Amino acid sequence: MAYQEPNKDGFYGKFGGRFVPETLMTAVLELEKAYRESQADPSFQEELNQLLRQYVGRETPLYYAKNLTQHIGGAKIYLKREDLNHTGAHKINNALGQVWLAKRMGKKKIIAETGAGQHGVATATAAALFNMECTIYMGEEDVKRQALNVFRMELLGAKVEAVTDGSRVLKDAVNAALRSWVANIDDTHYILGSALGPHPFPEIVRDFQSVIGREAKQQYRDMTGQNLPDALVACVGGGSNAIGLFHPFVEDESVAMYGTEAAGLGVDTEHHAATLTKGRPGVLHGSLMDVLQDAHGQILEAFSISAGLDYPGIGPEHSHYHDIKRASYVPVTDEEALEGFQLLSRVEGIIPALESSHAIAFAVKLAKELGPEKSMIVCLSGRGDKDVVQVKDRLEADAAKKGEAHA
């Protein structure tokens, strides 16, 4: 069956749409019109492809992780190396596309939200390239966790606004960015960093990130002589790297798709971000999606060791894939992600982002289950430089606790 989502109202099955105040409706309709025009203009995509090649460094390699595969003794593991992009993660694919779109729309200023700082850095980078003014909204907690990325953004000419509302994390940064957009609609474009928000944002982000899956599909054929892998694995916060990998394979029903959610301290605690495991449908940031909420519909605080995964919702297309059982979403704890982080570093000499480490941790389990005849592609969504100090502190604290327990 042909997969034709979203419909004209921005729905993926029962999820998505645009639940925004009148003040924002004009902006999202203007954005949709401009995006449709750009899709119909071959020069837009040609220019973007040239930038992706010459500036970002695409295409990124599909790397056969031979050591990891042998270490596990299961399915062959191929890593889609989004960590090798300029700025160190998949985020630049979308940021560059949207800044180029904003420039074409005649906008002068760019605003964005960021959690781990990767989308903020990517947006500030693209804004610098196109000589546009840039403000990044970041939860105060994340500003503390990701001080290095804050400095990077400032170095790139962006202004970083620390958001002190709510729990001072990603969802609060999104709220602040949306408020700013309402106040400055005429000359400002808001670059959402994940496949979230009111239509057409989830579609735009998916389309710009689908370069991941398109490349991986062709590279897998070229490398193996086989048509398709047996499985895909990607971490899911809002879900843009995962939708970028999954979407070009969605009609290939022999390919199993797995999104790994942040289970934090465990899905049976209050400290996790496992939206599809524990959430239910609700409206957040202009879109109907699965959301972590209490009995009264209040949004719960999401928790993860990884700043890029602690979002209490998930992109509507992922909610739809989950609903129609096209993809499975599995929780991975902080502890498991830390093991994945160390394992890939030690065995392959690749230090992954904590976000990507959630995918690695599950891939290890899945490889054992599938066995050596099968193969999978794992999206290595970002590099781990930004997380090394945090992991060092965490491992040292864990070791000290163990020492006390043995004393």
From Swiss-Prot:
- UniProt similarity note: Belongs to the TrpB family.
Subunit structure of this chain's protein: Tetramer of two alpha and two beta chains.
Instruction: Identify the GO cellular component terms for this protein.
Output: cytoplasm
Q: Which organism is it from?
A: Streptococcus pneumoniae (strain Hungary19A-6)
- The identity of this protein, by name, is Tryptophan synthase beta chain
Tell me where in this chain the PTM N6-(pyridoxal phosphate)lysine is found. Answer: K91
**Major enzyme class:** lyase
Annotated catalysed reactions: (1S,2R)-1-C-(indol-3-yl)glycerol 3-phosphate + L-serine = D-glyceraldehyde 3-phosphate + L-tryptophan + H2O
EC assignment: the record states: 4.2.1.20
Cofactor(s) recorded for this entry are:
pyridoxal 5'-phosphate
Whether Cytoplasm counts among this entry's keywords is no
> Which domain of life does this protein belong to?
Bacteria
